[in-house]
């Protein structure tokens, strides 16, 4: 499917699986270290938004990288360990539910991305960011790439790291707050989660009070 130039500053057809072509285009311009950036947790009613930044070694790319949403949990876990072993540098950052409520989810996600890039052990020459927005305040130039986790292996790697990190956080949250089943749905608005919120009320610091159906109904 063709995309308009407004969709992304780097225009390609969507491949069957992400590849290294986006990074290679930048490397041809003399840019050496390219970071992929993605986040997990924009939509849930509970928990943080988590962002990851990954700089891959072009000579040792992990096989099987893909958008984290197209992988099973077991496959994500396996690739997560491979990415941490093979990547040049990996960084993760998160913003809490309180931080999300204090601003909004879009700003919080972009800030988490910015912090993830800053946390890398080397300064990347360029950042490829999943979505339509480049986080303000990056320490390097960046490009937004629509469906980037399905187009760039660096972004796909970041999507896996962010997703696995957040899922593990929500498993721990589920153990601390059993009625909500957070370890099952990771904070998303499932029927069980909504029913638990109705019966138990939301948990301050865990639930997002600016998200429906919590917004305006409960005091934080």
Curated annotation (Swiss-Prot):
Its EC number is 3.1.26.4. Residues 32-220 form the RNase H type-2 domain. Manganese or magnesium. Binds 1 divalent metal ion per monomer in the absence of substrate. May bind a second metal ion after substrate binding. One of its GO terms (biological process) is mismatch repair. It catalyses: Endonucleolytic cleavage to 5'-phosphomonoester. InterPro entries: RNase_HII, RNase_HII/HIII, RNase_HII/HIII_dom, RNaseH-like_sf, RNaseH_sf. One of its GO terms (cellular component) is cytoplasm. A divalent metal cation binds at residues 38-39, 130. The keyword Manganese applies. Keywords: Cytoplasm, Endonuclease, Hydrolase, Manganese, Metal-binding, Nuclease. It is an enzyme of class 3 (hydrolase). Its cofactor is Mn(2+); Mg(2+). CDD domains: RNase_HII_bacteria_HII_like. It comes from the Bacteria. It is found in: Cytoplasm. Coiled coil: none annotated. Pfam families: RNase_HII. Belongs to the RNase HII family. NCBIfam families: PRK00015.1-3. Endonuclease that specifically degrades the RNA of RNA-DNA hybrids. This is Ribonuclease HII. It comes from Brucella canis (strain ATCC 23365 / NCTC 10854 / RM-666).
């Amino acid at each position: 499917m063709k995309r308009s130039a407004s969709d992304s500053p780097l225009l390609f057809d969507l491949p069957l699986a992400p590849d290294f072509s986006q990074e290679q285009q930048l490397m041809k311009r003399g840019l050496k270290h390219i970071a992929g950036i993605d986040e997990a947790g924009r939509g849930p009613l509970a928990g943080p938004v988590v962002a990851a930044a990954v700089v891959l070694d072009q000579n040792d790319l992990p096989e099987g990288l893909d958008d984290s949403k197209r992988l099973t949990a077991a496959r994500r876990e396996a690739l997560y360990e491979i990415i941490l072993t093979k990547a040049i540098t990996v960084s993760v950052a998160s913003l809490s539910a309180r931080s999300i409520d204090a601003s909004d989810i879009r700003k919080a996600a972009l800030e988490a991305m910015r912090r993830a890039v800053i946390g890398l052990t080397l300064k990347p020459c360029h950042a490829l960011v999943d979505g339509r927005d480049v986080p303000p305040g990056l320490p390097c130039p960046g490009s937004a790439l629509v469906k980037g986790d399905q187009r760039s292996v660096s972004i796909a790697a970041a999507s896996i790291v962010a997703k696995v990190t957040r899922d593990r956080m929500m498993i721990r949250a589920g153990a601390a707050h059993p009625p909500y089943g957070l370890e099952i749905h990771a904070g998303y608005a499932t029927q069980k989660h909504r029913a638990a919120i109705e019966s138990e009320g939301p948990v301050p610091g865990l639930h997002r009070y600016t998200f429906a159906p919590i917004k305006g109904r409960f005091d934080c």
